Amino acid sequence: MGIHKLMDLLKEKAPGCIKTSDLKFYAGRMIACDASMAMYQFLATTSSASDFQIQNLTDKDGNKTGHLVGLLNRTVMLIENGLKPVWVFDGKPPQFKSGELARRQKAKDEAAEKQKTAIETGDMQEALKQEQRNLHITKEMKADAIKLLQLVGVPVILAPCEAEAQCAALAKAKKVFATVTEDMDALTFATPFLLRNLNSKKEPITEINYEKMLQELKLSHNEFVDLCILCGCDYLGRIEGVGPVNAFKLITEHKSLEKVLEHMEEVNKQSTKKQKYTVPSSYDYVSARDLFINPEVTDPETIQLEWKKPDVEELKKFLVEEKGFSEQRVTSQMEKVLNAKEHKGSQTRLNDFFKVQPKDTSSTSKASKKPTNTKSANKKGGKK
């Protein structure tokens, strides 16, 4: 879900922080991409409905491959346009998110039942709709995605927890320029730049500038975090009676969730009819706030980003022999990678493009000590 209707709020209250650009504008930039979010998108867009069944891209054993098709195409598109993608995968979800995960699982179970009913009645469009609400990323699918990206030669990072938080940490440490995800909570994790709508090189990219956003909203980072929690986030249920515009008004006036909740309590006491605000019984905003301000991430200073030449032969074995891809298609995509160009009039030599990036010595946040990435050591985190 991310942050409920945050984009709509920014369009109204902080339009100057949003701009659109062509993909070529970011040539030469390193970007951290939320792999988990992208995989769900790719699975959804590669499903279709026939008169009698739901059709998915699969290998010879019936395993879905739509996420691999999408990751390959997206990665090649970015490299071909001069960008340097880093793919970041989710680790374990925070324990505090268990309630939201349970809610999502219930929704998936309901979608599965509705899909079954739709198939029985022959309504394949409804069945497809419910199929897309019941998508799962298995461990095997994740492992295949990582293998694909490593064979293509791009860096892969296994985050200890939330991928968006790790992407934001990399961007704050200037290891990359921006976070690429559709989830608006990357801003709550304070990514300097958020890029959305990298779905096609034909569509403009939406860029959100974090510092300009705070300036236009006239909020500090902590106040913005409280605003996001009040709007509705993945960690907590929403307060009945509060929409994004009202949430912004309350935070602007009262500056913190503590003061907002005190105000709500007073308003409810004075109400002679139905209470205006209904706060969930387990509204642990303090823990939610801490997850945003002090997320569990790998220390960016321990991460070395390295772009390598693709292992074309191994990639063909994996995609063509195991996953049923067209050899011609794989060859064509790898030729695009090997012929990658900068898009500002100059051509980049292959050895320049796939070189080890120098270690960045810029400041970074504290993070988790738990080792989850083969190319980095994690450090457990204190306050940022």
Curated annotation (Swiss-Prot):
Residues 359-376 have a biased composition (Low complexity). It is found in: Nucleus, Nucleolus; Nucleus, Nucleoplasm; Mitochondrion. CDD domains: H3TH_FEN1-Euk (cd09907), PIN_FEN1 (cd09867). DNA binds at residues 74, 162, 232, 234. Binds 2 magnesium ions per subunit. They probably participate in the reaction catalyzed by the enzyme. May bind an additional third magnesium ion after substrate binding. Its EC number is 3.1.-.-. InterPro entries: 5-3_exonuclease_C_sf, Flap_endonuc, HhH2, PIN-like_dom_sf, XPG-I_dom, XPG/Rad2, XPG_CS, XPG_DNA_repair_N. Mg(2+) 1 binds at residues 34, 90, 162, 164. GO terms for molecular function: 5'-3' exonuclease activity; 5'-flap endonuclease activity; DNA binding; magnesium ion binding. Gene3D superfamilies: 5' to 3' exonuclease, C-terminal subdomain, 5'-nuclease. Its main location: nucleus. One of its GO terms (cellular component) is nucleolus. It is an enzyme of class 3 (hydrolase). Residues 126-254 are annotated as: I-domain. It holds the Pfam family XPG_I. GO terms for biological process: base-excision repair; DNA replication, removal of RNA primer. Keywords: DNA damage, DNA repair, DNA replication, Endonuclease, Exonuclease, Hydrolase, Magnesium, Metal-binding, Mitochondrion, Nuclease, Nucleus, Phosphoprotein. Residues 340-384 are annotated as: Disordered. Residues 346-354 are annotated as: Interaction with PCNA. Belongs to the XPG/RAD2 endonuclease family. FEN1 subfamily. Structure-specific nuclease with 5'-flap endonuclease and 5'-3' exonuclease activities involved in DNA replication and repair. During DNA replication, cleaves the 5'-overhanging flap structure that is generated by displacement synthesis when DNA polymerase encounters the 5'-end of a downstream Okazaki fragment. It enters the flap from the 5'-end and then tracks to cleave the flap base, leaving a nick for ligation. Also involved in the long patch base excision repair (LP-BER) pathway, by cleaving within the apurinic/apyrimidinic (AP) site-terminated flap. HAMAP family: Fen. This is Flap endonuclease 1. It comes from Tetrahymena thermophila (strain SB210).
